[in-house]
Amino acid sequence: MSFNTFGKQFRFTTWGESHGPALGCVVDGCPPNINLKEQDIQVELDKRKPGQSKFTTQRKEDDKVQILSGVFEGKTTGTPISLIIYNQDMRSKDYGDIKDKFRPGHADFTYFKKYGIRDYRGGGRSSARETAARVAAGAIAKKVLENKLGKKFKVVGAVTQLGILGCDTRKWNDLTINKNPFFCPDKNMLKLWEKYLLDIRKSGSSCGAVIEVRARGIPVGLGAPIYSKLDMDIASAMMSINAVKGVNIGSGMNSAQLSGEQNSDEISQKGKKLKFDSNNAGGILGGISTGQEIVVSFAVKPTSSILTTRKTINKFGKNTTISVKGRHDPCVGIRAVPVGEAMMNCVLLDHYLMNKAQCS
């Protein structure tokens, strides 16, 4: 299986499976002399790790990261940074009854048809467990960007819609997001979401979500025309996350309903200060950052592993039914928030380094 590497100048390769002994990544292209310790990575992994609330999978993983290379005396050396996270709480026996069956909506069918073999234990490589390695890589990108761009730089993500219940993003509050188990930016939605998701969990079903990621303190000029557009790479990054089925940049699909006057973000200058009257472009024009807040949202489909009995086939081409036991997220979108933040950080650093190489 190829295509496990993401990025150009700053790139990472992830490895490992859901029920294997460990997973991890190798980060290449990180600048030297950046202060980095395991705790810098751990704090991001702790946002994503399972078993932290009744609203996520009850699989218990500490997700303790170890830095194996690329850091000396607390600083990056410019050489590849290798990271490892050991798996602890696997229950492969939960999948014994379905090892020959394809879960509807999951990658089981396509993996088997393409490769002729698949790891049925927790989905193997197609499991959202793989995203722990991305979050680790994103934590390194975040450290570099904070060093290069300063205190104004920030990437923050939130769940803005849980199933059929959306929140008012005009009430977005960064401080609220990390104080609730949903990464919800609007405290008024918390009780509604709690009841909604508990009912879904009790029924044995699942729901989808919409996640929004915002990046602030980004300079003008990141990205390049045509085949290296910043929004193109951000969209690719978000679409690579497990279960993501759609991405919007700025107004996204809604921009098709706007008039030219409504959609255009008018610009004015007051002294040395540039002002945009709106941000339908999501902080990117012509594939290049405008200096505004970059706003990206993506839709995550409902978790495919559910208790409800469904029709399917087995690997021998026979009709059968399936009901998936085990421990699964009733909404995988919740834990996708730190993954989206990580991928945003990786893309931004990649383009920052490419821009420095070409234009500095």
Swiss-Prot record:
A Pfam family the protein falls into: Chorismate_synt
Pathway: Metabolic intermediate biosynthesis; chorismate biosynthesis; chorismate from D-erythrose 4-phosphate and phosphoenolpyruvate: step 7/7
Residues the record lists as binding FMN: R125, S126, S127, N242, A243, G286, K301, P302, T303, S304, S305, R327
Cofactor note: Reduced FMN (FMNH(2)).
GO terms, biological process: amino acid biosynthetic process; aromatic amino acid family biosynthetic process; chorismate biosynthetic process
Cofactor(s) recorded in Swiss-Prot or TrEMBL: FMNH2
Coiled coil spans: none
One GO CC term, this protein: cytosol
InterPro entries: Chorismate_synth, Chorismate_synth_AroC_sf, Chorismate_synthase_CS
CDD domains: Chorismate_synthase
GO molecular function: chorismate synthase activity; FMN binding
Function comment: This reaction introduces a second double bond into the aromatic ring system.
Subunit: Homotetramer.
Protein name: Chorismate synthase
Organism: Pelagibacter ubique (strain HTCC1062)
